[in-house]
């Protein structure tokens, strides 16, 4: 659960409840707010409820309202740790080990010198179509890089995964990392709190679309 309270008009009272089975551990936090949650066990469920009062209006022009402390954010998840949550994504970042990716890198870089490699690979990925679906809209599923190659399009996450795989197949550094949209205790940062995937690679340093935001 990642609930930024982004209301365009001031709110006198805002109520948010999260329910899980009573025996399931739940990590939760309210960021940029002081209201203490009410925790109850009801009919075999654990229910955590926040009642927020007098919330100021949210202004959409703010690029990082949660990080700046201007809006309350409610976080909740059942993962044992942030690392466990990220394993859901990490298990899908397999591009560098796919035969089709290695073959494509070899084909694209045939006859190219070392200084040309990263530009050739980036231009290829840039040339693919882009689906605007976010991670949450895809259910945090990332199609295999081979499927992205076959269909010639991908989400931003899928294209970053493919580029990382191509770079690694070419002997260059490229690692997919995440940026979170809010600062919170690690165990409260589930998948919903991810604001963007980005590529950590010295060979593309300064390329804006692959850099982290909201860190």
Q: What is the predicted role of each segment?
A:
Residues 1-138:
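Secretory-pathway-linked proteins and extracytosolic
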Residues 4, 109, 148-155:
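Conserved aromatic-histidine-acidic binding/catalytic patches
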Residues 5-7, 145, 194:
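Residues embedded in well-ordered secondary-structure elements
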Residues 58-73, 152-168:
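Short secondary-structure boundary segments
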Residues 114-120, 125, 132, 146-151, ...:
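Active-site-proximal cofactor/substrate-binding loop regions of enzyme domains
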Residues 129-152, 184:
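Short, conserved helix/loop micro-motifs enriched in His/Cys and acidic residues
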Residues 157-215:
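Hydrophobic/aromatic-rich core segments of domains that either
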């Amino acid at each position: 659960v990642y609930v930024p309270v982004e209301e365009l008009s001031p709110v006198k009272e805002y109520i948010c409840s999260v329910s899980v089975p009573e025996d399931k551990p739940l990590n939760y936090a309210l960021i940029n707010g002081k209201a203490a949650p009410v925790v109850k066990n009801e009919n075999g469920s654990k229910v955590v409820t926040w009642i927020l009062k007098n919330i100021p209006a949210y202004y959409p022009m703010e690029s990082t309202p949660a990080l700046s402390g201007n809006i309350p954010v409610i976080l909740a998840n059942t993962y044992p740790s942030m690392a466990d949550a990220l394993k859901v994504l990490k298990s899908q970042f397999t591009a560098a080990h796919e035969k089709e990716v290695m073959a494509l890198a070899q084909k694209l870089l045939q006859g190219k010198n070392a200084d040309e490699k990263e530009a050739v690979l980036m231009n290829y990925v840039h040339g693919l179509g882009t689906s605007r679906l976010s991670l949450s809209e895809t259910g945090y599923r990332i199609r295999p890089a081979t499927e992205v190659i076959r269909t010639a399009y991908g989400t931003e996450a899928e294209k970053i995964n493919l580029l990382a795989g191509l770079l690694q197949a070419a002997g260059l550094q490229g690692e997919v990392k995440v940026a979170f949209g809010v600062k919170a205790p690690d165990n409260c940062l589930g998948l919903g709190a991810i604001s963007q995937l980005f590529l950590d690679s010295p060979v593309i340093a300064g390329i804006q679309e692959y850099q982290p935001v909201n860190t």
